[in-house]
């Protein structure tokens, strides 16, 4: 997906480590976006031909559920394109299933020429534990920039105390709280909705 100048988004997989009830991509046609070797070659060719692309974003699904072999094939191709300066990966794996990140995965993420930015998705401080701390330490020591995005969810984190605790816990684990999103309107998730007015008051 090449929607904005300077960056391109790759839907790396339709699989996730956890299924979020409020996911805005639940009806995305993942079957049409299978990441086989032929598709990877086509994507890399497109990025190579567009020298204005400086950032590649891997999303999904969750790109870190890919095998180290498949992820390595994609990352090696991206890293060989000299005008790509940043690789941004959006994932919930570090907090919901950190065991999926093997030594091979970590080696891939920490050996890139391009700057790697890992945008985690943590909505509540209770999602952070000793396992996530150990993993974040390894990634940070390997030069990976760690950011976080949260979705404002009614009854989960729509109060100042929880949001403050979340920010503090993220900072303690070396992750910068970066995005706080309003919920996208998806079927079956209206009970999580927080009004924009309340969201603005929480941020004031």
Give the residues covered by each predicted segment.
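N-terminal [4Fe-4S]-dependent radical SAM core
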Residues: 1-10, 27
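Short, well-ordered loop/turn elements at secondary-structure boundaries
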Residues: 4-6, 17, 52, 174
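Conserved catalytic-core segments centered on acid/base and nucleophilic motifs
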Residues: 10-11, 23, 56-58, 63-64
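Local cysteine-cluster metal-coordination motifs and their immediate loop/turn environment
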Residues: 12-26
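Iron-sulfur (Fe-S) cluster-binding segments and ferredoxin-like electron-carrier domains
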Residues: 23-35
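Surface-exposed cleft-lining segments at the edges of enzyme active sites
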Residues: 30-32, 60-61, 89
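Conserved AdoMet/S-adenosylmethionine-binding subsite of the radical SAM
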Residues: 41, 45-55, 64-203
